[in-house]
Amino acid sequence: MSELTRRIIFAVIAAPASIAIVYFGDWALAIVLSVLAALAAWELFRMARETGALPLEPAGIALAALLPLAVHAQRLGVYTLSLTAIIAMILLLFASTIWLRGPAGKPLSSVAITVFGVMYAGLFSYIYALRYHDYAVGAAAGTALVFLPVLLTWATDVGAYTFGRTFGKKKLIPSVSPGKTVEGAVGGLGLAIVICLLYVRFILMPYAQLGLTIQGAVLFAIVVSVAAQTGDLAESLLKREAGVKDSSRILPGHGGILDRFDSLLFVMPIALLLLGRLLLPIPL
């Protein structure tokens, strides 16, 4: 089976499954995001080991997996994740590293990469937060909100690839990602703007009773597109340092979790923040 065939089969299965999971939300979404966060943390720690770092893998993976579940528990009023709890977690990691490994176990760098991995992989929690945004009334509205930044991230990727292959001449940041061009970045941004305007008009307004002004939609698309490209470059930088082509081979034809979600992890927190300020209710 060719690489392209595997990609197509995976996409055909993953797309409707993703929509269904986001639509039904609740524990199903929290558990899926928890698994994704755990796998993303594992991939990041795997790359870190290639550079000589010694992350606390079992603890880091477990904590990353707990974050989406904690957000779900917070929505249900069962538990509230506080800053004090996060600080206590970091101190506990540091203390356990010193106790188990001693100074030779690089406690400072071990804790630093572990905490970074937990927080980075834990960004999957923002998908859950956007699904249950304060302005989203009902499953359809929450699902429409989640897939707005998802679609813009995809549009940025497609636009950057297409315009880069067709018109690309000036390299964007060759030391990080030699294949990316300025023309591709601009093309990705332009396609994201077009898709955002269409999505707001034909999906968000009728199905979520929410909208954005034209200026708001353009601003949102620009910020999301820049964030998506930054996230992609950030993971390219990490992979370059680790000397690996893919973060793993978990997804058939697509590499690893971080290879597919690197842009979206940067986008989701920003999307949640911006939509809270730009969304407008549409009267029925």
Protein language model features and the residues they cover:
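Interfacial loop-to-transmembrane junctions
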Residues: 240-264
